Amino acid sequence: MSDNAQLSGLCDRFRGFYPVVIDVETAGFNAKTDALLEVAAITLKMDEQGWLMPDTTLHFHVEPFEGANLQPEALAFNGIDPSNPLRGAVSEYDALHAIFKMVRKGIKDSGCNRAIMVAHNATFDHSFMMAAAERASLKRNPFHPFVTFDTAALSGLALGQTVLSKACLAAGMEFDGTQAHSALYDTERTAVLFCEIVNRWKRLGGWPLPVPEEA
């Protein structure tokens, strides 16, 4: 086998996908009927040596859409009061329009083709983002409609943990339980965790992949 292929660009690392870390806080588990209340997004970048790191952050409190369910148990869990005017909440359209604009710029600047959502238990966050985009009639959704990177699964493989707080601690990161279930904090921790897993694989020699020598 020859030396590893020198693939250090973000567009090379994930076959043209542009990873964006997302976390949502909601008023329930049903993306079609329960309110999206908070969302944060962090884009990622690579340095010249191919190390992955967080880049740009956006964070919004979100107004419940008209007719949305607000499950008391969910509100008690995340501590959000949707009626609090100090939240400075914006519409689903405004929040996702801004996030999608940031993501599309990142895709273009990095030479990628499409965004891929990175999230902890990603099916949940992906379903709420897709449902909100549909309600807001946002046609230019940059995210893949079903492919995600789930840090719960990746953490189980790389660290032996699937809970976000435990995975962060296993990775040698700090995790403040008093800030958990804030979309901004959870997104920041998830972004650092994902970068650590990707970079750890690189440090261990798993990337770039070896390529066969020419005959």
Swiss-Prot record:
Annotated positions binding Mg(2+) 2: 23, 25, 181, 186
Any one Gene Ontology cellular component term annotated for this protein: cytosol
UniProt keyword annotations, A-Z: Exonuclease, Hydrolase, Magnesium, Metal-binding, Nuclease, tRNA processing
Residues covered by the Exonuclease domain: 20-194
Required cofactor(s): Mg(2+)
Catalytic residues (UniProt): 181
A biological process term (GO) from this entry: DNA replication proofreading
Enzyme Commission number: 3.1.13.-
Cofactor binding, note field: Binds two Mg(2+) per subunit. The active form of the enzyme binds two Mg(2+) ions in its active site. The first Mg(2+) forms only one salt bridge with the protein.
Top EC class of this enzyme: hydrolase
InterPro entries to which the protein is assigned, alphabetical: Exonuclease_RNaseT/DNA_pol3, RNase_T, RNaseH-like_sf, RNaseH_sf
Signal peptide residue numbers: none
Residues under site feature: Important for substrate binding and specificity: 29, 77, 124, 146
SUPFAM superfamilies named among the record's database cross-references: Ribonuclease H-like (SSF53098)
Positions contributing to Mg(2+) 1 binding: 23
A molecular function GO annotation: nucleic acid binding
Record-stated family: Belongs to the RNase T family.
Biological role stated in the UniProt entry: Trims short 3' overhangs of a variety of RNA species, leaving a one or two nucleotide 3' overhang. Responsible for the end-turnover of tRNA: specifically removes the terminal AMP residue from uncharged tRNA (tRNA-C-C-A). Also appears to be involved in tRNA biosynthesis.
PANTHER family, sorted: DNA POLYMERASE III SUBUNIT EPSILON, RIBONUCLEASE T
Subunit structure: Homodimer.
Protein name per UniProt: Ribonuclease T
Gene expressing this chain: rnt
